[in-house]
Amino acid sequence: MELILKAKDIRVEFKGRDVLDINELEVYDYDRIGLVGANGAGKSTLLRVLLGELTPPGCKMNRLGELAYIPQLDEVTLQEEKDFALVGKLGVEQLNIQTMSGGEETRLKIAQALSAQVHGILADEPTSHLDREGIDFLIGQLKYFTGALLVISHDRYFLDEIVDKIWELKDGKITEYWGNYSDYLRQKEEERKSQAAEYEQFIAERARLERAAEEKRKQARKIEQKAKGSSKKKSTEDGGRLAHQKSIGSKEKKMYNAAKTLEHRIAALGKVEAPEGIRRIRFRQSKALELHNPYPIVGAEINKVFGDKALFENASFQIPLGAKVALTGGNGIGKTTLIQMILNHEEGISISPKAKIGYFAQNGYKYNSNQNVMEFMQKDCDYNISEIRSVLASMGFKQNDIGKSLSVLSGGEIIKLLLAKMLMGRYNILIMDEPSNFLDIPSLEALEILMKEYTGTIVFITHDKRLLENVADVVYEIRDKKINLKH
């Protein structure tokens, strides 16, 4: 293998926190690396360092080949060099950056990178805004790409198909795992089990030593009390009494020394961290929110036209009570329109009178409120503070985040907060438009667990194949102006 990139002593600080603290990284030709980690871990910062856009003091960088960069959406720019055949296959119908959709911009920047003759591609969320067809086409293109690939992505299916090595970025450090994302998950689970066994052994040994030390102290106290009792008695032979007291004192000291030795052994055990457990919550609904209609939402021969474009013609569907229903289909096919038709109770759509619908929109994440996180969650919520904390923790919120004002939260944090609030709200039907967008993988996996355990009905749009497989028990595909039941 030929080395194309080597970096040493990558140290980046931000507001007193070590964002990156990496001794050495190497990228070889034919490497297929997935860079994973929580939002804010420094993944995009690391790509900027490797590209030379950011040069930390003392960092040594050796680039032995040309690199192309697929940036996040808001960084896209038009360039001169393009493979217009590839642009067309990716679905970009025009090149006016001002009027492009998010999906078209994403496809354009991918085409720009693949058009260049480079030794490696660094990609930051390349599947953003792509529909399933676009993602599958991108996977095919990258499989034929002969250079190295280092990619940040929250699409687990994409990572499974493309990468054979995972770099996990956590606490500023990179840990390398061989295999795709599913292989990485299995290795992480083995690590968790090993850590759990080590932690249980540590707790048991510490408890054993603490009991033994306490027993020695207890024995020493008994000897001390015995000595005090015997000193009150008169003895006609002073030498015998003194010898007896010396013997007792020696035993007492021996017991205390044994206790101290055990305490030193406890200290020598060090500290073993408990493994991160999966936080679960038991969702509940009040009697007032119970639905009994087996199909609380039904669409019968609905029609919808935008300008001269018909989205639906005599299309029908029904949403089963308690089901997790996924709406799939290409970009612009009518998925969000169908949700809006349901929310607006448009002609042909019947909704149970007792339905209480919670709605999560793709772009509903702008908040300027000074209300703090816990106050926001507690409003119109029947769950106690402990349960709220549990859900927030599962979505990646730390203890010190609970008191933060909404106005200082990032867009990703607001999205996680809105999803958590909706799941704990006074609803019996949830409608989610691309809930996985902008979530890091840990938060996405936590959301999956919450969605599966939710007791009400969920209708959601997603292009995330793993989310679809893991959560949906009913799947509708919008195609040819119809709403087709897939399973």
UniProtKB/Swiss-Prot annotation:
Probably binds to 70S ribosomes, contacting the P-site. GO terms for molecular function: ATP binding; ATP hydrolysis activity; tRNA binding. It is found in: Cytoplasm. Residues 216-254 are annotated as: Loop. It comes from Streptococcus pneumoniae. Residues 189-274 are annotated as: P-site tRNA-interaction motif (PtIM). This is Probable macrolide resistance translation factor MsrD. InterPro entries: AAA+_ATPase, ABC_tran_Xtn, ABC_transporter-like_ATP-bd, ABCF_EF3_subfamily, P-loop_NTPase. SUPFAM superfamilies: P-loop containing nucleoside triphosphate hydrolases (SSF52540). A probable translation factor required for resistance to some antibiotics. Probably interacts with the stalled ribosome to provide antibiotic resistance. Confers resistance to cladinose-containing macrolide and ketolide antibiotics. In E.coli strain DB10 expressing this protein the minimal inhibitory concentration (MIC) for macrolides erythromycin (ERY), and azithromycin (AZI) rises 8-fold (from 2 uM to 16 uM for ERY, from 0.25 uM to 2 uM for AZI) and 2-fold for the ketolide telithromycin (from 1 uM to 2 uM). Induction: Expression is probably tightly controlled in vivo. Transcription induced by erythromycin (ERY) and azithromycin (AZI) but not other tested antibiotics. Expression is induced in the presence of ERY by the MsrDL leader peptide, which stalls ribosomes, preventing formation of a Rho-independent terminator structure and allowing translation of this protein. Negatively regulates its own expression. Probably part of a mefAL-mefA-msrDL-msrD operon, where mefAL also encodes a leader peptide that provides upstream control of expression of the whole operon. Residues 214-249 are annotated as: Disordered. The lineage of its organism: Bacteria, Bacillati, Bacillota, Bacilli, Lactobacillales. Keywords: Antibiotic resistance, ATP-binding, Coiled coil, Cytoplasm, Nucleotide-binding, Protein biosynthesis, Repeat, RNA-binding, Translation regulation, tRNA-binding. ATP binds at residues 37-44, 329-336. Residues 214-227 have a biased composition (Basic and acidic residues). Residues 185-233 form a coiled coil. Belongs to the ABC transporter superfamily. ABCF family. Residues 5-196, 297-485 form the ABC transporter domain.
